[in-house]
């Protein structure tokens, strides 16, 4: 059988297979689990016809990849972006399966969305698209079946429209989406969760590998890419702790702050992005330098912590080498698969070289805070109650600490490396192996492989 070319999915699968080699060599029976888990349980593709402001019919493709339900209902975001295709959604759903396993919560993996572009669309057009999209998706989701969430292009407004459409179609008010408004079933710190969780994870990495670059020190220089939800709240948490944020970016370029970003400026960028604006409109601000068409990684002479927070494959091999020249010690993904395979190889080679090397954390571990709080939102909905901000934040800190410990332990045991003095274990191997074992064991107990 000739399979379609799916580069993003094949990259994610290749990364997992490479990480699992030492574990599978010692546990060959799990080869069958790997063969089975890589195929989604169900793939849905459908037509979405909606009316534009001129009264004309427009059409887009809608998708939902229900990847794996071994640990709970399918769980993963809905992405609205012109680049959306089956390869990207399979990669995201595959990664989501193991990411959700690392949270310790009862969630399977899935991903969906459409090649619809919300940029430049009116509020009415987005509402009509969401209503049409949900008119097909509603028959495949539910609080105990599949619980979608937001993602790129799908914010609070879109979640509201999707929830309203589902409520009308099913005549029930249930927690079948996460990222909801606080007044109707949402959770405190859900918007902040991916960025906050990333920093909680990174704090553990720094404490073990590079305590001299504590985020409580203004001398610690942090590079962040992106300027959406993840990047904004990552930056705000870094500033709150005391370190210096040097960069943000968007699809058109990077904005470098010589003396560091302020909380007020980050919030201003948040308002700009809500209106669909670009960072280039802030290029003339004193103390900031805009670089059109460039990502931040090669623009900074000195950086200690790098946090990709934009999209997949946003750090290349050359950029990874430039970060090492700039003195980076910690790289943790806020975006999914933010680093290319070649970039990861550069970081892992640096780690293996010994003391002073780069310690890299993959997105499935370091950015699982977002879906963790989505899981906490599901728990609150099931009990018909709402926890306080502090309660949710404390639970998130605990989940990220446990995720770090799981990855550290599995990386130490199953990396296949002889861990020498000064060499840190691979969090890449640890995250992949720990997530895989948890999913595979549940599948075996369900009779999905033997």
From Swiss-Prot:
One GO-annotated biological process of the protein: glutamate biosynthetic process
Highest taxon above the source species: Eukaryota
UniProt-listed Enzyme Commission number(s): 1.4.1.4
Catalytic function, reaction form: L-glutamate + NADP(+) + H2O = 2-oxoglutarate + NH4(+) + NADPH + H(+)
InterPro entries: Aminoacid_DH-like_N_sf, Glu/Leu/Phe/Val/Trp_DH, Glu/Leu/Phe/Val/Trp_DH_C, Glu/Leu/Phe/Val/Trp_DH_dimer, Glu/Leu/Phe/Val_DH_AS, Glu_DH, Glu_Leu_Phe_Val_DH, NAD(P)-bd_dom_sf
GO cellular component: cytosol
Keyword Oxidoreductase: yes
Keywords for this protein: NADP, Oxidoreductase
Enzyme class: oxidoreductase
Keyword S-adenosyl-L-methionine recorded: no
Active site: residue positions: 111
UniProt GO MF annotations: glutamate dehydrogenase (NADP+) activity
Quaternary data: Homohexamer.
Family membership: Belongs to the Glu/Leu/Phe/Val dehydrogenases family.
Protein known as: NADP-specific glutamate dehydrogenase
Source organism: Laccaria bicolor (strain S238N-H82 / ATCC MYA-4686)
């Amino acid at each position: 059988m000739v399979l379609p070319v799916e580069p993003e999915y094949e990259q994610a699968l290749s990364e997992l297979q490479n990480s699992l080699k030492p574990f599978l060599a010692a546990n060959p029976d799990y080869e069958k689990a790997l063969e089975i888990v890589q195929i989604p349980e169900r793939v849905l593709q459908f037509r979405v016809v909606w009316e534009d402001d001129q009264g004309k019919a427009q059409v887009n493709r809608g998708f939902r990849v229900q990847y794996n339900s071994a640990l709970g209902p399918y769980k993963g975001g809905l992405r609205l972006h012109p680049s959306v295709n089956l390869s990207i959604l399979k990669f995201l759903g595959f990664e989501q399966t193991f990411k959700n396993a690392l949270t310790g919560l009862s969630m399977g993996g899935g991903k969906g969305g459409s090649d619809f572009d919300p940029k430049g669309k009116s509020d009415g057009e987005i509402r009509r698209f969401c209503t049409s999209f949900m008119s097909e998706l509603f028959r495949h989701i539910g609080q105990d079946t599949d619980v979608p969430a937001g993602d790129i292009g799908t914010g609070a407004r879109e979640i509201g429209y999707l929830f309203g459409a589902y409520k009308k179609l099913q005549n029930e008010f249930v927690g079948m989406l996460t990222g909801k408004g606080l007044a109707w079933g949402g959770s405190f710190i859900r918007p902040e969760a991916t960025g906050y969780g990333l920093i909680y994870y990174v704090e553990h990495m720094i404490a073990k590998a590079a305590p001299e670059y504590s985020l409580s020190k203004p001398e610690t220089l942090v590079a962040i890419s992106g300027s959406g939800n993840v990047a904004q709240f990552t930056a705000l948490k870094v500033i709150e702790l005391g370190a210096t944020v040097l960069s943000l970016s968007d699809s058109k370029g990077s904005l470098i702050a010589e003396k560091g970003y302020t909380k007020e400026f980050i919030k201003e960028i948040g308002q700009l992005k809500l209106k669909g604006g670009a960072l280039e409109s802030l290029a003339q601000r004193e103390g900031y330098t805009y670089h059109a068409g460039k990502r931040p990684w090669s623009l900074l002479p000195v950086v200690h912590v790098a946090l990709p927070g934009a999209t997949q494959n946003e750090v290349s091999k050359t950029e990874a080498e430039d970060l090492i020249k700039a003195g980076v010690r910690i790289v943790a993904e806020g975006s999914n698969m933010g680093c290319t395979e070649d970039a990861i190889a550069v970081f892992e080679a640096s780690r293996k070289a010994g003391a002073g090397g780069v310690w890299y954390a993959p997105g499935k571990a370091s950015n699982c805070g977002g879906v963790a709080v989505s899981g906490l939102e599901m728990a609150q909905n099931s009990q018909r109650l709402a926890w306080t901000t502090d309660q949710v934040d404390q639970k998130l800190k605990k989940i990220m600490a446990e995720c770090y410990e799981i990855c550290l332990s599995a990386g130490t045991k199953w990396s296949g490396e002889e861990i020498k003095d000064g060499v840190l274990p691979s969090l890449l191997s640890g995250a992949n192996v720990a997530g895989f074992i948890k999913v595979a064991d549940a599948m075996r107990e369900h009779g999905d492989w033997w």
